[in-house]
């Protein structure tokens, strides 16, 4: 009789993937500081920051484009400097969690759009 192979319990688990997101018109000249803040928060929370996406104001429906990337890369959370970059958590939280740097807050996956205004 053969035994099934069992992996040793100390194999490290992969970190959940995060995607940084910022809008150039909101970050302005401070976009590099915003990128660093996103990276620092992702690292502290145990996420693997896959990349940071910067959108300029000329892009039509930037959240739609962001959600395409989120789905393709199987992202667990989008991290953004402030809620102003996203406009509200509703669309993002149908697909993944949304985390803001300032104030630091996490809107979980499956967030209810009726809760748009608060925590």
Q: Residue ranges of each PLM-predicted region?
A:
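Short, structured surface patches at the beginning of a domain
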Residues: 1-119
